[in-house]
């Protein structure tokens, strides 16, 4: 799957855009750290021939695991973690920024008043910005 994503990313780059490659690791996988290490090995190989991309990755269990990946930017998926846990995990990483669309919307509901909605989303944005 990673090879396929890089093949498509090359086509996107050839069209003048910066591709985002998103090989997500399931946060509930019993061997998450092992899978993440396998993914890093594969990404390092792929990035040797094409690194004009942004990687959107699950926050690793091991701080700094992605530090040596050579690409334009690495952003973190909240990946199913709660907003607070995703932010705590992200703070342990040096070179990752948040891309937390699901966590950003945590606690937002259709029946909130505009004031409640604005207050909650402002709080979420603040937590994510601080973690990044």
Regions found by a protein language model. Give the residues of each.
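Extended, alpha-helix-rich binding/interface surfaces that flank or overlap catalytic cores
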Residues: 28
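Glycine-rich anion/phosphate-binding loops
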Residues: 1-7
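Short beta-strands and strand-loop turn motifs
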Residues: 21-24, 102
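Catalytic-face loop-and-helix region of soluble metabolic enzyme cores
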Residues: 50-130
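Long, contiguous binding/interaction regions
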Residues: 13
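Catalytic beta/alpha-barrel core
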Residues: 1, 18, 22, 31-61, ...
